Amino acid sequence: MTRARHPIVMVGLCALMVGEAVWSMRNDLIPTLAHHAVVVLSAVVMVLVGELVRVHMPSGRVLAPISSAVGFTLVSLGAVQGSASFAVRPGVVILCYATGQVLAAALRREVDTTGGAAARLLSVGILVHLIRGVDVAGRTLWEWQLVSSTPRWVVAAALVCGASTALVIERLLTAMHRAHTLRTSTATALRDEFEEAPTVTFAGAAPGPIATLIAPVAGVLALPLALIPLVITMISVRRYTEVWRTLRQTIQTLSRLTEAGGYTPPDHAHRTAQLGRAMAQRMGLGEREVTALEYAALL
């Protein structure tokens, strides 16, 4: 199997999902968007910002937790103070989220080759069909949250479980693509994904329920307000990645001492480290073992 440069399968599934959304909304898409213009525009802008403000992990993973959190918020959003209740079909949520992603890609002027954007769109699409499309005792889960007799803690717990499930799907899809790209085993990629990514990823399960519960009082401002805990988590994770980046730069600098002294050919340590890393990935070693081997080769 040749190495894939683009997540073709996931992109194809995303294209089918967006196409189905457009087809299902072909008769009332414009009126629906106009009726919920404030919420839709706010969500698209926030998805755009979330796709641009990403977290680069030490292993090379690129995460966009704000983008995922905004998508999950759109899925569960109901009553909104000062605006009409966000009672829309699943296709509207999918199109809003995809629009924000496309605009972000256009501003970055680069195509996402990590599979992350496609995985996020697919996870949002799956969640919106579960929340807004599956009947439970005669009502969808989204309709149950509007029933005043439903305890708020039950609503919050259900929404957190739904968002967590979508995040697991996102990580699974990303791990499968990463395993194919790096030519390592899927089991190893899954293990590494759930060792490194959950710190910031699963913090994205909370903003959706928070925004949904406070939107009847706070209105559209509920969307950015609910993201504050996630933003704080992202800042902490970014500092963590900066420490690892500094460590890596220090080791790379030390590896050049033998070159400067004339004991090894130019870039010898770098070539050895890259070869060792590639072999370790082919053998199915985890990210920690691969990194340790790379650092040992550099030194």
What is each of the regions a protein language model found here?
Residues T201-L299:
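Acidic/His-rich, divalent-metal-binding segments that scaffold phosphate/diphosphate chemistry
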Residues M1-L223, T233-V237:
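Membrane-embedded alpha-helical hairpins and interfacial helices in multi-pass inner-membrane proteins
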